Amino acid sequence: MNEQTISRFAIILLALVMAVFGIYHFIYPQNLVGYVPSFLPDLGNLWVYIPGAAFILAAIAFITNKKVKLAAYLLAVLLFIFVLTIHLPNYLNASSDENSQMALINILKDTAIAAFALHIASNSPN
């Protein structure tokens, strides 16, 4: 396999992961609404649906190879916002070792995915 094929496979794999995350946001919003920062206005599940839609739209962009640069940059920004407003506060204010570990895992996961999205954006012609 050449490098371009491997790169395309990696991007499609990320797209599938993001699509699953997005679908999960729509199927199980009640499991995620508790993570919405308290400084945001109370709009119920809307705060869960918006990133879910963003994940699905990023997946579509990656799979169709349209607007990849924009989608990847926006995905990275969204994930860094999650790290700073959700996962880091959860880590710093964790009520148990288990919660602290889960928050740290989420910090690392979202940072890694954001870094990959930045790599995709920086190498995408469109």
Name the predicted role of every residue range.
Residues 1-27, 47-53, 57, 63-126:
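Extended, low-polarity transmembrane helix blocks
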Residues 9-10, 29-42:
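Short juxtamembrane and helix-loop transition motifs at transmembrane-helix boundaries
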